[in-house]
């Protein structure tokens, strides 16, 4: 596995791989990697011949009161994990490499519709930052395919629309959420939880599953279902940010009669905000 820091080095390495007839797979990350990231890299290796991973903690997607400064930087451990997972090329640019003219002057990309509401309401500007950095990375790497985890469901919807609307020549794959044995979705932010908070955290997925079971059983009063689920989260010691039933492509509010739904949740444990989701298929 080679590690490069500049766009010039990145493009040269990818060009060599492509000249050898290799199919390029790409997994963008912010580092502090866990088993969920490793699963994405391994899956990329199944779908492509040459796997590129980026590690870049993107300032554009953090709000002024968010955790940019304390977000863990664990490059040495990340490199070991990526080597084991089958990464061929690691791109670790600095802020100056990604935004050479500064962030204030950076052209930004807004993806309407799917960016609004949910995490978009709680984190103004977040998805603009995501769409901008993903657009830049896809243009830098120019992969045949890119993989993202379904845990960040709204982010995946934003990226799919971005790629579709801008006619970017890349296949986007969403991969299932990797979970701990107790159901908690793996996340870099789980490391912020103390022992008591970590014990309470699986209530998010448990509540989503219970809500999904009620919908599959035929319950159609979505407001009442959501009220019960919010109460369950609060009783478990969480502070809900949002809990919504949506249609999975457009992310419009789900209605009885929809055959495909996704339940999305964000909740706080102390100062740590966790997200999760559950797809519900009624066909």
UniProtKB/Swiss-Prot annotation:
Pathway: Cofactor biosynthesis; (R)-pantothenate biosynthesis; (R)-pantothenate from (R)-pantoate and beta-alanine: step 1/1. GO terms for biological process: pantothenate biosynthetic process. The keyword Ligase applies. ATP binds at residues 30-37, 149-152, 178, 186-189. Beta-alanine binds at residue 61. The active site is at residue 37. One of its GO terms (molecular function) is pantoate-beta-alanine ligase activity. CDD domains: PanC (cd00560). Keywords: ATP-binding, Cytoplasm, Ligase, Nucleotide-binding, Pantothenate biosynthesis. InterPro entries: Cyt_trans-like, Pantoate_ligase, Pantoate_ligase_C, Rossmann-like_a/b/a_fold. SUPFAM superfamilies: Nucleotidylyl transferase. It is found in: Cytoplasm. Its EC number is 6.3.2.1. (R)-pantoate binds at residues 61, 155. It comes from the Bacteria. GO terms for cellular component: cytosol. Homodimer. Belongs to the pantothenate synthetase family. The reaction proceeds by a bi uni uni bi ping pong mechanism. Catalyzes the condensation of pantoate with beta-alanine in an ATP-dependent reaction via a pantoyl-adenylate intermediate. This is Pantothenate synthetase. The lineage of its organism: Bacteria, Pseudomonadati, Pseudomonadota, Gammaproteobacteria, Pseudomonadales.
């Amino acid at each position: 596995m080679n590690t490069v820091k500049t766009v010039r080095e990145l493009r040269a390495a990818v060009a060599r791989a492509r000249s050898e007839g290799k199919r390029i797979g790409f997994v963008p990350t912010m580092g502090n990697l866990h088993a969920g990231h490793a699963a994405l890299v391994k899956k990329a290796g199944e779908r492509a011949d040459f796997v590129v991973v980026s590690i870049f903690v993107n300032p554009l997607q953090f709000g002024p009161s968010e955790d940019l400064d304390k977000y863990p930087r664990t490059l040495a451990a990340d490199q070991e994990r990526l080597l084991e997972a089958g990464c061929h090329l690691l791109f670790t640019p600095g802020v100056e490499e990604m935004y050479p003219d500064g962030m204030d002057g950076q052209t930004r990309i807004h993806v309407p519709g799917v960016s609004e509401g949910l995490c978009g309401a709680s984190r103004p500007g977040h998805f603009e930052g995501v769409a901008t950095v993903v657009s830049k990375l896809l243009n830098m790497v120019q992969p045949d395919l890119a993989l993202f985890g379904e845990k960040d469901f709204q982010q995946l919807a934003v990226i799919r629309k971005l790629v579709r609307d801008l006619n970017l020549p890349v296949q986007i794959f969403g991969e299932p959420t990797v979970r701990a044995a107790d159901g908690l979705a793996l996340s870099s932010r789980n490391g912020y939880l103390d022992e008591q908070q970590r014990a309470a955290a699986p209530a998010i997925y448990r509540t989503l599953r219970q809500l999904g079971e009620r919908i599959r059983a035929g319950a159609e009063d979505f407001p009442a279902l959501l009220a019960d689920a919010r109460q369950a989260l609060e009783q478990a010691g969480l502070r809900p940010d949002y809990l919504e039933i949506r249609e999975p492509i457009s992310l419009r509010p789900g209605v009885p009669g929809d055959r495909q739904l996704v339940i999305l949740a964000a909740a706080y444990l102390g100062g740590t905000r966790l997200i999760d989701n559950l797809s519900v298929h009624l066909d």
